[in-house]
């Protein structure tokens, strides 16, 4: 960041030497008062933006770490997929066994009638 030459206080306390046929001191003071207000406003805005920048950079670092952790986790993903497939196969076999027995019983009962 560029170094500032003046602070609002420096501008406020600046004394000009009066010269013959120079500028009206009241006009100069009025103008400098407005410059001071603008300068203070810019300083506050700059500080707020710096704080926001720091907060956002910290958030980016945090999210980058989360992505890095997520990138290492997929190695455990196939294990859970295999486990899910195993569960689905077992469930299918169980359904075939239970519902197949019921179908056999229903067919036997229909032949008896």
Curated annotation (Swiss-Prot):
The record's listing under InterPro entries reads: Cell_cycle_GpsB (IPR011229), DivIVA_domain (IPR019933), DivIVA_fam (IPR007793)
A Pfam family: DivIVA
Q: Work out whether the entry's keyword set contains Transmembrane helix.
A: no
Would you tell me the Gene Ontology cellular component terms? cytoplasm
GO biological process: one example: cell division
The domain of life is Bacteria
Q: Where does this one sit in the cell?
A: Cytoplasm
Coiled-coil intervals, chain numbering:
32-71
The protein's UniProt keywords, in alphabetical order, are: Cell cycle, Cell division, Cell shape, Coiled coil, Cytoplasm
Q: What is its main location?
A: cytoplasm
Q: How does this polypeptide assemble, per the annotation?
A: Forms polymers through the coiled coil domains. Interacts with PBP1, MreC and EzrA.
Instruction: Please name the NCBIfam families in this protein's record.
Output: DivI1A_domain, PRK14127.1
Q: What's this chain's function? A: Divisome component that associates with the complex late in its assembly, after the Z-ring is formed, and is dependent on DivIC and PBP2B for its recruitment to the divisome. Together with EzrA, is a key component of the system that regulates PBP1 localization during cell cycle progression. Its main role could be the removal of PBP1 from the cell pole after pole maturation is completed. Also contributes to the recruitment of PBP1 to the division complex. Not essential for septum formation.
What family does this chain come from, according to its entry? Belongs to the GpsB family.
Designated name of the protein: Cell cycle protein GpsB
Q: Which organism is it from?
A: Lactiplantibacillus plantarum (strain ATCC BAA-793 / NCIMB 8826 / WCFS1)
Q: Which gene encodes it?
A: gpsB
């Amino acid at each position: 960041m560029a170094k500032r030459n003046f602070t609002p206080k420096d501008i406020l306390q600046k004394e000009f030497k009066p010269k013959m046929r120079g500028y009206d001191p009241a006009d100069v003071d009025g103008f400098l008062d407005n410059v001071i207000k603008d300068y203070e406003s810019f300083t506050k805005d700059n500080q707020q933006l710096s704080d926001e920048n720091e907060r956002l950079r910290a958030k980016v670092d945090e999210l980058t770490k989360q992505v890095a952790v997520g990138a290492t986790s997929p190695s455990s993903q196939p294990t859970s997929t295999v486990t899910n497939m195993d569960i689905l196969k077992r469930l299918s076999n169980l359904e075939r066994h239970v519902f197949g027995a019921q179908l056999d019983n229903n067919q036997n009962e229909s032949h008896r009638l």
